[in-house]
A protein has these predicted regions:
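Bacterial Sec-dependent N-terminal signal peptides
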Residues: 1-24
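Structural detector for internal amphipathic alpha-helices that build alpha-solenoid repeat scaffolds
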Residues: 542-546, 570-591, 603, 611-626, ...
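Terminal, low-structured helical/coil segments at or just beyond the last alpha-helical repeat
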Residues: 798-822
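Short inter-helical turns and helix N-cap capping residues of alpha-solenoid HEAT/ARM repeat scaffolds
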Residues: 565-566, 608-609, 643-644, 674-675, ...
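Acidic/His-enriched low-complexity segments
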Residues: 18-274, 398, 413-415, 431, ...
Length: 822
């Protein structure tokens, strides 16, 4: 699963509960689930699922006289065993079936359960990664665009079929899904039969022959067009999109076959499943989900060719694909060991970026991951493998993802590439179609390398925190001396063992690498050099999971930026030279008043890597200091010539307040750019000065389906606050994906604030529906925030009271207690 993070730490203060977590080990297995056969059909009118489950089970080891299934929120119509109806007890969560006798591990039994799943009647939970946990979702069920899909992780598949809903339970399956014959279905495994019925329905029989985890079982149905990728012949690779987007399937997903081949080559293990399908659905409650052979994506991956110029979702696609080895083929045996799934998937994003887009792109991916972890580490530090937590959903954080991926890279650097991938091969083959814990991974590495690696796994997987180093360097009498101290305090009370690279650079651009090994609180290293270095860089590729405080003069940082061969080294130098609090524009201007720093920033707009060019452009937003004309000229060149759309777009935004009519010529030319991000930025920049043809410009773009362009048009319409714009706002907002909708709700709020009461009342049904019915808690919360802007209206107060009463997510319920409506 890949997290789609939208709101950082919104509820941290709400949930900082002083509570000692309990030990969370693997679920005890009293029974083994051998095979699941499901006959299911959706009732679109009441958003329920009619089902019959035939479950083949056997005692795991000890004899048993009853079985308990996870079955959340069902109406259980009857249960039979050995062709006879049997009594059962059911509390709405657990379904207990007694046998009246003891069964031993040589007995295989078949239980038949007739039921109706009622997911909308469940109390809703969720997390940052998975915003709801009711398992089965109906989207627009009473319209031609209706969809049905499931989300099983962590333990929500028991909301739509009875099972043993734990990650250490594997099964094979047959699913018979009956739907209207106009709909397309998808499930795990292969579609082996279509049965047409006389009532305009069809039953699709999907069969999964190889065992996989229960939480990876899925179904989906809707109006989808299936595109089979003809560039790949080893097995079926296919993509499911709604009809209006089907023509873009290969542009969106078409690098999947190359990813498969690359990962197979790295791991020495062929893709282990029958097929690989990807489907994009609306209102998905996560970023994406690696259901075996049938990955589900949120509709954020659905992009037009103009949007793909700005950004593709290769990282997400690679992430979910890599799970089919790490997570699906070998599955974590408990949520405590989740990094065995997610850290590897996170690392795959680096592997693919490095392979396909180049080493600099891989470094940039790693930099972003490290930044994500370090931000989270300011508020919590946990072991990667956590046997103590309050809620399994807490495991889905930047520790399990970003930090874990970086730790795997450190392990790779320590043992070497060949040993790393050979060890992964051993791990995958030894645990194929089974579950694993962290020590299975350690023992695979020890088997290959011949080295005891407990120290590494204890230090990085089983202990919280990260390394923090203080570094000083000085050169005297032909010798460079490094003094490195490890910070020891209440947050970090241990000494790390750290192999580190040191990059030493000289005035002629020459560089040399040295290696040091830290194992003490304070250590001194010396190197004989023929000349004084112009910069010294610890960990030049940014591979250490940690923080390095290495004070340097500006001249050294400038030399480091200009001469360092790594993106990480240049990034660190640029960041230190130009860092300022995000809201402190005056401080930024003061930094750029230094001609040497300003010159470097202008040089950085020509960096070989687009991410650093973009950072440089962003430092020049609204610049009005010394050397203004030089800055303006450089930004004009960026707009005309930079190959990256995001850099061009940011250059336009940097110049939008420069008040030079000549720039408007550039902006108008940019309205024809292939990139929607560039067009949106150009439109925003032009509208700043409210040109005579502003209304005509906006009219041209008001129906373009892109969030960047929407935001530019919406800001203009919000300031106008004309009554007739309400239908445009609500219509367009309904078309946006979840992330996009959250991003622009503030603009709609601006429109409402500046409108009269009649328009505000007209918006209330839209906001009320969103606040109650959106599956994503952050969208419901955003709708409430917009309603509060018009909260003086009696009708709004009444609506808010109804929203608060209808809310089932405990996080939001707790927040809403703070709002006074009277």
């Amino acid at each position: 699963m890949r997290i789609c993070l939208l709101i950082s730490f919104l509820f941290i203060t709400q949930f900082s509960i002083a509570q000692l977590p309990e030990y969370q080990g693997s679920a005890t297995k009293k029974w083994d689930l051998l095979h699941t056969k499901l006959y299911v059909s959706p009732n679109w009118d009441n958003e329920q699922l009619n089902g019959k489950a035939i479950l083949q089970i056997k005692p795991h080891f000890y004899s048993q006289n009853e079985v308990t299934f996870d079955a959340k929120g069902f109406e259980v119509k009857g249960i039979s065993y050995n062709s006879k109806s049997v009594e059962f007890s059911y509390d709405g969560l657990k379904l207990v079936v007694p046998f009246g006798k003891m069964l031993n591990r040589r007995d295989t039994v078949e239980i038949i359960i007739d039921y109706v799943a009622k997911p909308n009647e469940l109390e809703v939970g969720g997390s940052e990664a998975i915003t709801q946990d009711k398992g089965l979702y109906f989207v627009d069920p009473k319209t031609p665009k209706r969809q049905l899909w499931t989300q099983g992780e962590t333990q929500a598949n028991s909301c739509w079929f009875p099972t043993f809903d734990t990650p250490n339970e594997n099964h094979t399956q047959d699913i018979f899904l009956r739907v209207d014959k106009t709909l397309t279905t998808l499930s795990n495994g292969e579609l082996i039969e279509k049965i047409i019925h006389g009532d305009n329905t069809r039953t699709d029989h999907w069969q999964m022959k190889k065992p996989h985890a229960v939480y990876l079982t899925m179904i989906a149905a809707g109006n989808f067009v299936k595109t089979v990728d003809s560039t790949f012949n080893d097995f079926e690779v296919s993509y499911y999109l709604e009809p209006e987007y089907a023509e873009n399937a290969l542009a969106i997903f078409g690098r999947t076959p190359q990813m498969i081949c690359h990962f197979e080559e790295l791991l020495g293990v062929k893709y282990p499943w029958e097929k690989y399908s990807q489907i994009a659905v609306r209102e998905f409650v996560s970023g994406a989900m690696e259901n075996t052979t049938a990955t589900v994506h949120g509709d954020f991956v659905v992009k037009s060719p103009n949007q793909l110029v700005d950004n593709n979702d290769d990282a997400v696609i690679a992430h979910e694909l890599f799970h089919h080895w790490f997570g699906d083929l070998v599955t974590t045996e408990s949520w405590a060991n989740l990094p065995l799934n997610e850290s590897f998937a996170d690392y795959s994003e680096y592997l693919w970026a490095s392979h396909f887009y180049g080493e600099e792109a891989g470094e940039w991916t790693a930099i972003q991951a490290m930044e994500n972890y370090l931000v989270e580490a300011k508020t919590k530090q946990e072991p990667l493998i956590r046997y103590f937590y309050n809620d399994r959903e807490d495991m889905f954080d930047s520790h399990s993802y970003a930090k874990g991926g970086r730790v795997l890279h450190m392990l790779r650097r320590y043992v070497g590439d060949e040993a790393f991938f050979t060890s992964l091969n051993v791990y995958l083959k030894a645990n194929a179609f089974k579950t694993a814990e962290i020590h299975n991974l350690r023992m695979a590495f020890e088997e290959v390398t011949g080295e005891d690696l407990n120290w590494f796994f204890n230090q990085w997987f089983l202990t919280a925190g990260h390394a923090r180093l203080d570094v000083e360097d000085y050169y005297k009498n032909g010798k460079l001396t490094l003094e490195i101290d490890q910070t020891i305090d209440s947050v970090n009370a241990k000494i790390y063992h750290l192999p580190l690279d040191v990059l030493i650079g000289f005035s002629d651009g020459k560089t040399i690498y040295k290696k040091v090994y830290l194992k003490d609180e304070s250590q001194v290293f010396s190197f004989e050099l023929d000349e004084a270095p112009t910069y010294v860089l610890i960990d030049p590729k940014g591979e250490l999971v940690g923080e390095i405080n290495h004070p340097k003069k500006s001249e050294m940082l400038i030399s480091q930026y200009r001469n360092c061969p790594t993106v990480s080294g240049r990034f660190k130098a640029f960041q230190l030279l130009t860092y300022a609090p995000e809201t402190d524009e005056l401080y930024v201007k003061e930094l750029l008043s230094d001609s040497a720093v300003r010159k470097l920033v202008l040089e950085a707009t020509k960096d070989s890597f687009w991410g650093l060019r973009d950072m440089a452009v962003q430092r020049l937003f609204d610049y009005d200091g010394e050397g203004f004309l030089e800055v303006e000229k450089e930004l004009q060149l960026v707009i005309k010539a930079d190959k990256n759309a995001n850099v061009r777009a940011d250059a336009i935004l940097a110049m939008k307040n420069f008040l030079n009519p000549q720039n408007d010529i550039l902006f108008r030319a940019a309205l024809r750019d292939t990139s929607y991000a560039v067009r949106g930025a150009a439109l925003e920049a032009l509208l700043v000065n409210n040109p005579p043809d502003a209304a005509e410009l906006v009219k041209v773009f008001e129906d373009v389906r892109d969030v960047n362009i929407f935001a530019s048009v919406a800001n203009y319409y919000a300031e106008e606050a004309k009554p007739e714009r309400l239908s445009w706002f609500t219509g367009r907002l309904k078309e946006l994906g979840n992330t996009e909708l959250y991003q622009v709700m503030g603009i709609f709020g601006t429109y409402l604030i500046q409108s009269d009461a009649e328009i505000q009342l007209g918006a209330l049904p839209f906001l009320n529906d969103m606040a109650i019915n959106k599956p994503q808690w952050f969208l419901r919360y955003a709708a409430v925030q917009a309603m509060l802007l018009i909260g003086d209206l009696p009708e709004t107060k009444a609506a808010l009271k109804s929203v608060f009463e209808a809310e089932t997510d405990q996080r939001l319920k707790d927040v809403y207690l703070n709002y006074q409506l009277d």
